[in-house]
Amino acid sequence: MSAPIHENERIKARSNCLRGTLRESLADTLTGAISPEDTQISKFHGFYQQDHRDRRQARPEQYLEPYFGFMLRAPLPGGVCTPAQWLAIDGMGRELGGGSLRLTTRQSFQYHGILKRDIASVIRGINAVMIDSIGGCGDVNRNVLCNPNPVESALHREVYDWAKRISEHLLPRTRAYHEIWLDGEQVGGGEDVEPIYGRTYLPRKFKTAVGVPPHNDVDVYANDLGFAAVADGSRLIGFNVSAGGTGRNTGIPATFPRLADVLGFVEPERTLAVAEAVVTTQRHFGDRLDRTQARLKYTIERMGLDAFRDEVERRAGIRFAPARPIGFTDQGDRTAWVRGQDGRWHLTLYIESGRLIDGPGQSSMQGLREIARIHQGDFRITPNQNLIVARVPEPGKSEIEALARKYGLLDKGIALRLNGMSCVALPTCPLAMAEAERYYPDFLAQVERLTRKHGLAEQEIVTRMTGCPNGCARPYLAELALVGKGPGRYNLMLGGNGRRYRLNRLYRENLDEAAILAEIDTLLGRYAACRQPGERFGDYLIRDGIVRPVVNPAEDFHE
């Protein structure tokens, strides 16, 4: 007798390696939606069906179906793209992607509001410049993060190459994507084979990051799988491997955020074998009945870390060496020009909540379009939703900086903003309980007023906001975070550290804006008066006993 499984597992099994009935759904002109089963399969192709929640009430009154649109996400390993690719990305956003473009916390880009009839055109448009959307969503490995640090550029290039190789190695092998979206023909030669994923892929999504100490921009311990580079000078000698990090699910007490456990050290040549072994261990042992318990962290909690490590070693044919000493001492994007080891320059542009748009009072898409037309290097999306104009030769600096200033992409370097981010939330995310992206700028402005009041305007504080507990902006590592609870109400989370390897904890629940700001005002006043030299806000909150550190999240996160 077979074990019970979630309906999504049956949908994947009968999808014929992710084909489903997507062609039929796309051809159905009577609705702006795709079939319910295809909404699960479409995720593997990089897009989600959504509806515009600001229009939900009015549509039925007009005897209309919901205003359906699609969010399409395209992975860019390490967030790197060329100027030619950027111009194509921008063009698709302006023409078919709702007139905007969003940089994500996972160094990808995504469009919102694509109509069903335009999905194929968008996919073909980005494919023309060698970008695809397969694996942008779904129960597979998502975009692989890589530290965009331009200072240690020789080491960064080597680590970035490994991030690309991990990404390519863990891609689905099905031909369905090319058949449906690109050439329109089913390729002969027998059934697809998925050597890593199998017919039902993973129980849930899977996220991987590659970090370069001392900078933890990628939040390496907040990922299912993490590789922290270990270097001898500028030479990569291996990685400390970690597994089992991520956030939690909405309204389910049995779920909890968790930092990844360190499995040990491996040499670079073992990297792909270890990555595959962790993925296949999760494929085999992950929960396929309860999707709220299906992430890798819960698999490790059930198996125990030692048993999980043994299984990964067996599958990879390796033995982990003891983890090497490393230190994450920094995070956040650097402002101003930074010179790389190759003599070229890198400029980080501030993109509020990752949103690029042309409209009243802002023209960020146009500004980047003009920069891309003259830029000879590349662009790098950061895990903080900002954008690095990378590898600029000395003679090109002045023109690029002038364009950045003209279009308001510089001079926003207030410490609080550069260390903050938010998820999309309303009106497009179906899970959002409260505003995030649309409210975050106003919230930050009010917190900035409080930091100035207490003489803390130059103090970095990692601040994040999400519209629901799922935590797409990784709020559970922030020093100060708001997690949506309901319309206009948030849980106030406190106590992460500035280097992003300590979980925060619920401080106050279900607060409105006035109550949140009153709490922050009091806390900032205490911090300004009582902090020790060099002490960060989150560290002070722990030292002073305002919040207790989370030691074992499975047991004490909800206390």
Swiss-Prot record:
Reported cofactor(s): siroheme; [4Fe-4S] cluster
Binding site for [4Fe-4S] cluster: C423, C429, C468, C472
UniProt keywords, alphabetically: 4Fe-4S, Amino-acid biosynthesis, Cysteine biosynthesis, Heme, Iron, Iron-sulfur, Metal-binding, NADP, Oxidoreductase
GO MF annotation terms: 4 iron, 4 sulfur cluster binding; heme binding; metal ion binding; NADP binding; sulfite reductase (ferredoxin) activity; sulfite reductase (NADPH) activity
Entry binding sites for siroheme: C472
Entry's EC annotation: 1.8.1.2
Signal peptide: none
Catalysed transformations (reactions): hydrogen sulfide + 3 NADP(+) + 3 H2O = sulfite + 3 NADPH + 4 H(+)
Keyword 4Fe-4S tagged: yes
One Gene Ontology cellular component: sulfite reductase complex (NADPH)
Taxonomic superkingdom: Bacteria
Pathways per UniProt: Sulfur metabolism; hydrogen sulfide biosynthesis; hydrogen sulfide from sulfite (NADPH route): step 1/1
Gene3D superfamilies in the record: Sulfite Reductase Hemoprotein, domain 1
Cofactor note: Binds 1 siroheme per subunit.
PROSITE patterns: NIR_SIR
Example GO biological process: hydrogen sulfide biosynthetic process
InterPro entries in alphabetical order: CysI (IPR011786), NiRdtase/SiRdtase_haem-b_fer (IPR005117), Nit/Sulf_reduc_fer-like_dom_sf (IPR036136), NO2/SO3_Rdtase_4Fe4S_dom (IPR006067), NO2/SO3_Rdtase_4Fe4S_prot (IPR045169), NO2/SO3_Rdtase_4Fe4S_sf (IPR045854), NO2/SO3_Rdtase_FeS/sirohaem_BS (IPR006066)
Subunit text: Alpha(8)-beta(8). The alpha component is a flavoprotein, the beta component is a hemoprotein.
Function recorded in the entry: Component of the sulfite reductase complex that catalyzes the 6-electron reduction of sulfite to sulfide. This is one of several activities required for the biosynthesis of L-cysteine from sulfate.
Similarity section: Belongs to the nitrite and sulfite reductase 4Fe-4S domain family.
NCBIfam families: CysI, PRK13504.1
Protein name per its UniProtKB record: Sulfite reductase [NADPH] hemoprotein beta-component
Gene that this sequence comes from: cysI
